[in-house]
Amino acid sequence: MKISLSWLRRYVDVDVPVEELCEKMIMSGFEVESVEDLSASMSNVVAGRILKLEKHPDADRLQICQIDVGGQEPVQIVTGADNVFEGALVPAALHDSRLPNGMHIKKGKLRGVASNGMLCSFAELGLTQNDLPGVFADGIWILNDEDCTVGEDINLVIGNDDTVVDFEITNNRPDCYSIIGLAREAAAAFGKPMRHHEPVVHGSDAGDIYDHLDVDVPATKLCNRYTSRMVANVKIAPSPKWLRRRLRANGVRPINNIVDITNYVMLEYGQPMHAFDYRYVSSGKIVVREAE
């Protein structure tokens, strides 16, 4: 069971080094399988604003960019990308930066023109379009001004500013297959109070679900309770940035707001969930049974 320290700290104040947290949890009976610093694979990559573009004098496919990276002077970077433009906010790997694919970026010259870094694509940052749905992935990644500011560390932008601990959960502790379950154990181990929050269930424009849907549970020995709820007027869209960050940190690929919230609840509460598109529910009925 993976848990990010930032998510854990929403429930209990354990502002201690990760080594101390692991030691306490081991003493409480939990084996630590791994500890991962998400920011360790990438350094010195920041959000930069392209101030000026001009053609390379000796290469038709290269452009010379003057980029504001939050310092006193713009940084010059030569790129072969054709999707960049003046005013674009882009990931800039500066001199002596390191990328998740193992690349070590240093300043140099491209066809005789000084280049003090590299502009980065999704792949070069270790991402795919599934990590950030709804974003055009070809060429250099064009950042959203609402998600970051000039000079901001890209690790912060993509949610890599976190540490993830993977605990082995034994079969006799199913209550710890969740963020809240592990937070409860951490609170007990450190003698700290646990911060609880009660979910608020709002009404739905869909009315009574059983006016629209029938649920049959023949496999009662395997599933003694199945709860369903219908939500109307749903708009499928990318999830908020904070939610995508938490999912990625805990090893879950973001898809869209509906799928992501079911996965989020599963991780936080340990309650498996699934969302169905009502248009494709055959005969308006859900049957919970063993596979045939």
Which residue stretches match the model-derived regions?
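Glycine/proline-enriched, intrinsically flexible loops and inter-domain linkers
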Residues: 5, 23, 63, 190, ...
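Phosphate-backbone binding interfaces of nucleic-acid-interacting proteins
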Residues: 1-207
